[in-house]
């Protein structure tokens, strides 16, 4: 692999993870409000710690390139589930965009899962 490809793979992981790290951190700072929003959408607020762990922890693991394929698959599934549960009012333009943003991110995660993390990752250390 060349340096450009290696750098692009790392940059891609960082960019894909950024939204999840930021979302997980914001859920910590707005914990009660997020639980209420989840409950209003029919999702038990008790699941919030798992959501935060997946968003924040999964995002950081993706950046580090640790267990990358597994994390990418988990984030792909989470992205599709989140689209279906929280952004399903496709008649609302904002929700339409959010729905397909999540679906597009799932596609990016599936590519990462299929191709692996690249050279600049903990998964490839020592190789």
Residue spans of the language-model regions?
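Extended, low-polarity transmembrane helix blocks
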Residues: 1-29, 36, 45-53, 57, ...
């Amino acid at each position: 692999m060349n340096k450009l490809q290696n750098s692009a793979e790392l940059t891609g992981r960082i960019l894909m993870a950024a939204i999840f790290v930021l979302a997980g951190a914001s859920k910590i700072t707005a914990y009660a409000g997020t639980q209420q929003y989840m409950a209003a959408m029919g999702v038990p607020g008790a699941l919030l710690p798992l959501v935060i762990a997946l968003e924040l922890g999964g995002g950081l693991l993706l950046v580090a390139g640790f267990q990358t394929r597994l994390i990418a698959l988990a984030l792909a599934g989470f992205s599709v589930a989140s689209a279906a549960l929280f952004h399903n009012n496709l008649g609302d333009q904002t929700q339409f965009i959010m729905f397909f943003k999540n679906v597009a991110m799932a596609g990016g995660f599936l590519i990462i899962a299929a191709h692996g993390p690249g050279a600049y990752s903990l998964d490839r250390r020592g190789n």
